[in-house]
Amino acid sequence: MKSATLVLLSFLFLIACNSEKEAGDAAQNSPRIKKQTRLVSPKINAEYVLGDVVAFKIESETPVDSIVLEYEGKESVYLEKEFDWKAELGKTGIQKLKVSVYCQDLSETHYPKIIFFSDVTPTKTGYQVLQTLPHDPTAYTQGLFFMEDTLVESTGQKGESRLSKINLKTAQVYSSTSLASQYFGEGSTIWKDQIYQLTWTSHTGFVYDLNLKQKQTFSYPHEGWGITTFGDTLIVSDGTETLHLIDPRDFSEVGKLEVYTDKSKVMNLNELEMIDGILYANVWLEEVIVSIDPKSGKVLSVIDMSGLDDRFESDDAEAYNGIAYHAGRKEIYVTGKLWPNLFQVKFIPKN
């Protein structure tokens, strides 16, 4: 009986091994489904300048009925396998397109990815100091903006992050609220009757009323660096070249911009400020501000802010950060992390 059982088990084992081998061979020899169409041009990550015409070429083993190109929610229909396309929106950076090829009963989709550089060379700009004012040397500045005549500043560092209303002339803090110790505060801005403040890596933002009373929180999937207001949209930087466009009502992301010059992308975008319809951004660890077209992402000017920290003495002062614009008086103020001074400046052409 024991011998018969061993024979039966051996037989079943051989069957199982053969079945696994056949299944493995079948999977290995299974032909990969081959596409009937191929996107020949443009190549992936092909580089263009805004305004360039992009040449598309499709190869197909069967006659093509039509080709539909989709970009930013708009569709364009072509009847030939080779056609030219020009982006109407004119946004810099990586642009993702969808190309659907229709051949009789068959449809196949391709996702070309191309890069647009700016079509303008940024102007070189400098600055002139118009006024030197006091600034709290313990403030690790991350955000700076005006609420009418009141200067509002958000600061960083865990356990030290706060949002404060400040007297512009004396640097006296006359109203302030602190974040919980687990949060590293970042940029801040105002939209209508609400103030928005980011945190660095906690993926959490805070909404306050005009008296700095917290009303609610919101979340976002990326790091939070700088934030400013452009009409009914919040523009948020995350330390890369990407700017996130956020609806302040429901905090949904309604778009993105990638910031490019005519030669390269601009990384480390930090504190943001809108000045007369143009976006200005500090570049982290550089003594530079870039001005940006908020609709296209292209850099319009590079402002050299070097030498500003030579105007004070401090062993603790860190990176230049913070731009505030008083729209009524057309005044621009800048400072830095742990700086003892706030400067009113004017941007001027640089030879």
Predicted regions and their residues:
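Conserved beta-strand positions in repeat-built beta-propeller and related beta-rich domains
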Residues: 153-157, 197-202, 236-240, 281-285, ...
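C-terminal motif of bacterial Sec signal peptides marking the signal peptidase cleavage site
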Residues: 14-16
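Short loop/turn segments that connect beta-strands within beta-propeller blades
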Residues: 166-171, 209-213, 248-251, 293-297, ...
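Short, compositionally biased P/S/T/A/G/V-rich stretches that sit at domain boundaries
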Residues: 18-49
